[in-house]
Regions:
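Short, acidic/polar
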Residues: 87-113, 167-175, 245-257, 329
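Aromatic-rich peripheral "rim/lid" segments of glycoside hydrolase catalytic domains that contact
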Residues: 346-422
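Aromatic-lined substrate-binding rim segments of carbohydrate-active enzymes
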Residues: 105-157, 211-230
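Active-site-adjacent substrate/metal-binding segments within catalytic domains
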Residues: 50-139
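Noncatalytic carbohydrate-binding groove/subsite architecture in carbohydrate-active enzymes
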Residues: 206-322
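N-terminal secretory signal peptides
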Residues: 1-21
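N-terminal twin-arginine translocation
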Residues: 18-50
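Active-site groove signature of glycoside hydrolases
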Residues: 171-208, 233-238
Length: 422
């Protein structure tokens, strides 16, 4: 790893905390002993005196071949692109026992993440008919929190959105502490909920769907008597239109106005996904003389959490950029915990359908701290009873297999681990 450079952390100006309610909400004063979560406050809250850890997260979706999102729903094992359900335990757990009674060795990715210093996992897709308690329980055992995702499907006007009021209760129950989605409260591993991913890139839903879905979610929580304190984010890309002063300000201006989610502001966090260097993020955005995070917080009074942050290996300076991003983020979060809650490095493993090996030249697929190989660690044989997301007899789940592959470390592995564990 290259020698680390100290980053100057800007101090807040007089307008740094325009909304004192938001600041108080994310600055609690009491910690549950040994639990790392706050008593009576949102799970993201970090107190002024007993400061909970800055979230050092990782984006996690390390499917092996032949996974491809374009045809994942044609299979039982990859249906819904859900990495966290029970049948995926051969990837993230130490072992997996099928309903057939057979036990298979696991790749144990969650343990690897723990050893890297990760304390937050960001997921992308979640099928509410699946069971996820094993994954969530394992995260609790390892001291790792989870950003539980609402897949794009549920926000798309031509897919799940019109039926959202019937679908949302099932999603909420699938985030519960019940073994078969039958709990009465959110699982303790869940630190927050993220809805969708980058609507500006997929062009498949808008800020209007984000707003309406969130309102209906909160109303469903009340009806179901679930807690109404989990923070909610809406991940967006880092593109900037000609009319914007800074990336995604137009999106948030609408999302947070009176007719949308202004009344839920204290429940929200902003979740942009930059690839920019630390200088832009924390010191000088758009030649303004101040960093993006500081100015965005001052503008909206809502804390930020980067749900993706990284640089692909195709860029010649990617290692220096990643190192600066991580060090700058942790330093700024320590200095301004009310503004900046954490980061999720993008990502644990390359996208296997774009980068089946380290030698790939695809920029979108080569962000991983690990690369895939052709070495199969184990072949897992499933039986139909291992799957809960299908409506038999209309779906064939016979002879389904998963072949966890050996992962190899990339240069960013040492950078992330070195910084996260310091």
């Amino acid at each position: 790893m290259k020698k680390r450079q100290r980053l100057a952390v800007p101090t807040s100006g007089p307008k740094a905390t325009p909304h004192s309610v938001t600041r108080r909400r994310f600055l609690g004063t009491t910690l549950i002993a040994g639990a790392g979560t706050l008593l009576g406050t949102a799970p993201f809250a970090r107190p002024r005196i007993a400061v909970a850890p800055f979230y050092k997260g990782m984006c996690f979706q390390p499917f092996p071949q032949p996974y491809n999102p374009s045809h994942a729903n044609n299979t039982c094992i990859f249906f819904g692109s859900d990495i966290a359900y029970n049948a995926m335990e051969p990837l993230w757990g130490p072992s997996y026992t099928s309903f057939s009674g057979r036990t298979f060795q696991g790749r144990n990715d969650l343990q690897t993440l723990k050893e890297m210093g990760v304390n937050l996992i960001r997921l992308y897709d979640w099928e509410p008919r699946n069971f996820h308690k094993r994954f969530l329980d394992k995260c609790v055992d390892l001291g790792i929190k989870v950003l539980a995702p609402v897949s794009r499907y549920f926000l798309r006007p031509y897919q799940g959105f019109p039926n959202r009021r019937n679908l949302i209760p099932n999603l909420i129950r699938s985030f519960s502490d019940g073994e078969t989605n039958n709990g009465s409260t959110y699982h303790p591993a869940i630190a927050g909920i993220i809805m969708g991913n980058e609507p500006g890139i997929c062009q498949c839903y808008t800020v209007e769907q984000c707003s309406e879905f969130t309102k209906d979610w909160v109303e469903a929580e009340k009806r179901m008597r679930f807690p109404t304190s989990l923070p909610i984010g809406h991940p967006v890309d880092f593109g900037k239109s000609p009319s914007e002063r800074f990336p995604q300000w137009n999106f948030w201006e609408t999302l947070l106005d009176r007719t949308h989610l202004g009344h839920l502001k204290n429940r929200l966090f902003l979740s942009p996904q930059p690839q920019n260097d630390a200088f832009y993020l924390f010191e000088n955005a758009e030649n303004s003389g101040r960093g993006y995070v500081q100015q965005t917080y001052e503008q909206f009074g809502v804390p930020l959490l980067f749900t993706e942050l990284g640089k692909d290996r195709q860029k010649p300076n990617y290692q220096a950029v990643v190192q600066g991003q991580l060090e700058g983020s942790i330093a700024y979060g320590a200095a301004h915990p009310e503004q900046f809650l954490g980061i999720c490095h993008f990502q644990f493993a390359d996208k296997v359908w774009k980068c089946p090996s380290f030698q790939c030249r695809d920029s979108e697929g080569s962000f991983g701290t690990h690369s895939h190989t052709n070495t199969v660690l184990v072949t897992v044989d499933y039986v139909p009873e291992d799957f809960t997301h299908v409506d038999a007899p209309h779906y064939n789940c016979e002879r389904q297999q998963l072949r966890p592959d050996m992962l190899v470390q990339n240069p960013t592995y040492a950078i992330v681990k070195g910084i996260y564990t310091t």
